[in-house]
Regions:
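Acidic, metal/ion-coordinating pockets
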Residues: 1-136
Length: 136
């Protein structure tokens, strides 16, 4: 599963409880800055590397493209497939399409998701999928 923009909604207690529950259920996760930035799962004998990003505190930051591509390259070296997931982009009906520019939500930079995705592909990602904020 992906650690993303809501992981800190209930502070460190909620975050720790979520991580504990994932461990107990033997569910792999990635995207938690400095703790579990990437994960590798094995399915049908294939190593699948997963890294996840968002613009929020305690997550691996989508705004640091250099670091993101470093993680992707690291996974590429040891995995058969590399998957990148990210939460980014603006919010609201005016953001229904990718702008190819930096987008903001409530004053917070959500990054340039077009640039981010292409950088991850160039670094070796096999699949990049993104999701954004709720439409209002």
């Amino acid at each position: 599963t992906k650690i993303s923009n809501h992981i800190n909604d209930f502070g460190s207690e909620g975050r720790d409880s979520t991580i504990s529950t994932l461990h107990k259920a033997d569910i792999a996760y990635a995207g938690l800055r400095k703790k579990c930035e990437t994960t590798v799962v094995i399915r049908n004998g294939k190593r699948i590397g997963i890294c996840c990003f968002s613009p929020n505190a305690v997550t691996v930051n989508i705004l640091n493209i250099t670091y993101a591509t470093t993680l992707v390259r690291s996974l590429r070296e040891k995995c058969d497939y590399v998957i990148v997931s990210f939460h980014g982009g603006g919010e609201g009906k005016e953001f229904l399409h990718v702008t190819r520019e930096e987008e903001f939500c409530f004053g917070q930079s959500r990054g340039n998701v077009y640039l981010f995705a292409h950088a991850c592909i160039d670094a070796g990602a096999d699949l990049v999928f993104g999701h954004g904020a709720s439409l209002r």
